[in-house]
């Protein structure tokens, strides 16, 4: 019911802003490589390289990564938000002035109304997108387009990058596990680095690079398994390579594990600006 209520509340903003179909028609195929920035504890060490190569890739960042990138002066092309909770909306409760220019915020249409309030308050460019939910399709808003967004904002960014015809998808900060010191997020994370450290029971899973095991929890494990299923389908049906350049956290089976430096030097050879 929360999703239905918030969708109805957000509907005027959806129909008065550009559609998802319009985004695809204007942006499809303009870049070969997408970097998906998640908010795992390994993100911090990748920020200097990301800043150096930012102009050579299309950057999709999670809502929670957005304030971190802003702090370090790294401008993403897209900021994605999937969840419908009020605490998630708070990632947009800030004002970064000129930094936001040319960033497109892609937000699921059932998002909390505070999300829209913060976006409008700072004149940010945004698009509300919908999944294939029955109650949404009943309204016949086909013109605005639909897409399956998965269970996490990283899935959403991955699908979006596929729809925009990227040939290489690079994940960073996609730990899906706790750091060695027990932190669940980077030091700059808005809700504290240990926000999820004691929230769930810890489970062991194979580590990045097959080097032993790391601690995770059941929600991250579900995200990991769904991502692995997606990568298997991508490998089977598309000419797209998926790289896990997190250099930490859990192993995501099927993703090509490479240092982020290797990916930057070998895949990012031209300036998109």
Which residue stretches match the model-derived regions?
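Glycine-rich phosphate/pyrophosphate-binding loops
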Residues: 65-66, 73-83, 161-185
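Non-catalytic helical/linker scaffolds that mediate oligomerization, partner binding
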Residues: 157, 170, 174-184, 188-195, ...
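Active-site/ligand-binding-proximal alpha/beta "capping" segment
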Residues: 113-172, 176
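Short hydrophobic/aromatic-enriched beta-strand-loop microsegments
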Residues: 58-61, 75-84, 106, 124-130, ...
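Acidic, Ser/Thr-rich peripheral helices and adjacent loops at domain boundaries
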Residues: 80-101, 129, 186-204, 262-271
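N-terminal donor/sugar-recognition subdomains of glycan-related enzymes
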Residues: 1-36, 41-58, 67, 71, ...
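Short, acidic/turn-prone active-site loops that include or flank metal/cofactor-
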Residues: 63-66, 81-88, 109-111, 130-134, ...
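A structural signal for short, well-ordered beta-strand segments and their strand-loop junctions
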Residues: 61, 127, 168-173, 180, ...
């Amino acid at each position: 019911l929360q999703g239905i209520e918030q969708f109805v509340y957000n509907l005027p903003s959806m129909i008065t802003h550009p559609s998802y179909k319009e985004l695809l028609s204007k942006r499809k195929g303009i870049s070969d490589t997408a970097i998906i920035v998640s908010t795992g504890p390994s993100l911090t060490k990748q920020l200097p390289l990301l800043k150096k190569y930012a102009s050579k890739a299309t950057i999709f960042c999670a809502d929670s990564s957005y304030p971190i990138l802003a702090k370090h002066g790294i401008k993403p092309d897209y900021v994605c938000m999937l969840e419908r909770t009020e605490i998630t909306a708070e990632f947009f409760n800030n004002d970064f002035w000129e930094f936001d220019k040319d960033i497109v915020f892609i937000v699921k249409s059932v998002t909390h109304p505070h999300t829209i309030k913060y976006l409008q308050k700072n004149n940010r460019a945004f698009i509300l997108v919908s999944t294939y939910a029955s109650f949404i399709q009943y309204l016949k808003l086909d013109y605005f387009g639909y897409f399956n967004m998965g269970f996490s904002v990283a899935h959403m960014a991955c699908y979006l990058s596929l729809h925009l015809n990227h040939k290489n998808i690079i994940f960073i900060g996609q730990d899906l596990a706790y750091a060695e010191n027990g932190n669940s997020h980077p030091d700059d994370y808005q809700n504290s680095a240990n926000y999820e450290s004691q929230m769930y029971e810890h489970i062991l899973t194979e580590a990045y690079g097959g080097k032993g095991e790391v601690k995770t929890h059941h929600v991250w494990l579900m995200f990991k398994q769904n991502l692995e299923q997606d990568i298997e389908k991508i490998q089977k049906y598309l000419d797209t390579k998926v790289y896990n350049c997190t250099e930490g956290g859990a192993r995501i089976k099927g993703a090509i594990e490479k240092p982020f430096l290797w990916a930057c030097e070998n895949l990012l050879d031209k300036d998109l600006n």
